[in-house]
Amino acid sequence: MAKGIRDKIKLVSSAGTGHFYTTTKNKRTMPEKLEMKKFDPVVRQHVMYKEAKIK
């Protein structure tokens, strides 16, 4: 079987709470690291989430 072109990634909160989201990303069309603003339920506000590898 062929290896898929989508990688599993983890989006970690920049607020330092340890909260994270998991998602997939197409590594061929988006080689740069993903950053997006999402809701952090620990601090109850929208903060920047940055891409990290899933261990």
From Swiss-Prot:
GO biological process assignments: translation
PROSITE patterns for the chain: RIBOSOMAL_L33
Quick one: a GO cellular component term? cytosolic large ribosomal subunit
Q: List the disulfide bonds.
A: none
InterPro entries to which the protein is assigned, alphabetical: Ribosomal_bL33, Ribosomal_bL33_CS, Ribosomal_bL33_sf, Ribosomal_zn-bd
Entry keyword set? Ribonucleoprotein, Ribosomal protein
Q: Which GO terms label this protein's molecular function in UniProt?
A: structural constituent of ribosome
Pfam families, alphabetically? Ribosomal_L33 (PF00471)
Q: Which family does it belong to?
A: Belongs to the bacterial ribosomal protein bL33 family.
What is the protein name stated in its UniProt record?
Large ribosomal subunit protein bL33
Lineage, top ranks: Bacteria, Pseudomonadati, Pseudomonadota, Gammaproteobacteria, Enterobacterales
